Amino acid sequence: MMEDSKAWIHRQWPGHPPVTHSVIKGNDIPVIAAMANDYDLVVMGTQGASKFKDIFLGSTTNGVCKATETPVLAIPENASYCPLRKIVLAVDDYEVTGKKVLDPLIELADLHDADIKIFHTDMGTADLGVDPIIGMYLAGKEHSFHYAATSLKINDSIHEFVETEKADMLCLIGRKRARINNLFHRSVTKREVFQTEIPLLVLTDIAVITDF
């Protein structure tokens, strides 16, 4: 089956970069996460949670997003390829600890000459807003900031903005943290893996945050 898939790829996209394959026995999430350490990007298919295989695929992709520091690109089952013209970067109010966190997003935007829309949902008086250093990291790139003060849940707010902008990709920043009362990574990323209708790029900020 793997050889058939490899041959099909060669027929569909002649001249593409070399394709190799491996079959490894083990639990899917830790195996994929361990392999991801040797690569720059993990690309996975994902589906909604309407039936068993969908739950399996969605849970696996979400689990890999949490288990690896390598960026993960989740492709919904019904997504079709189109050039990236608009990418929505949905952010919380925590700092981005280095430009390298955003480098995969910047490289994709450069490759497609895409516009980056930074989107933030204001969660109320305790909300600190968008880390201004994001603008510095994106200097020289086509980007803009957008805010929403809404009673909608964060995911619904993101979806509304994505649809309004007719975005081609959504990007989230997952965070490796010690103790933190913040639902953005765990809850929002999980829901997007199951619900998104466009490709989802999950980046990782590995700084340990110790809010109590």
Q: Which residue stretches match the model-derived regions?
A:
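Intrinsically disordered or low-complexity boundary/linker segments at protein termini
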Residues: 13, 41, 46, 50, ...
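Hydrophobic/aromatic ligand-binding patch that stacks against planar heteroaromatic rings
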Residues: 63-65, 108, 191-192
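Small/aliphatic-rich secondary-structure junction motif
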Residues: 86-149, 163-170, 195, 207-209
